[in-house]
């Protein structure tokens, strides 16, 4: 994780993406999908960011932002973002740039 707040309710990580040039930053649409895999017979699939997880105890979300040369995946929670970060670790991220 690139950044984690002291209360662990916010964190993010950045990935260099040299394809996001000044022109892309100013004019393009960028979307991200996270691969969802399962240990049973459930078929794999892709889910688009942002992702929101709500239950009776807590709510967490993950979302995409970008700047010239990088993307940032941010996590927010009313408790700790640790579990959500663990869920995303090791998953394939698909980035779509439409310019």
Can you say where each PLM-predicted feature lies in the sequence?
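First exposed extracellular module after export/assembly in secreted or surface-exposed proteins
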Residues: 1-99
């Amino acid at each position: 994780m690139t950044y984690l707040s002291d209360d662990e309710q916010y964190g993010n990580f950045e990935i260099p993406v040299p394809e996001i040039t000044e022109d892309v930053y100013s004019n393009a649409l960028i979307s991200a999908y996270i691969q969802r895999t399962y240990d049973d017979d459930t078929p794999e699939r892709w889910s688009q960011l942002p992702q929101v997880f709500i239950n009776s105890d807590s709510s967490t979300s993950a979302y995409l932002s970008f700047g010239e040369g990088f993307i940032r995946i941010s996590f927010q929670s009313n408790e700790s973002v640790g579990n959500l970060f663990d869920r995303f670790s090791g998953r394939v991220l698909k980035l779509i740039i439409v310019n």
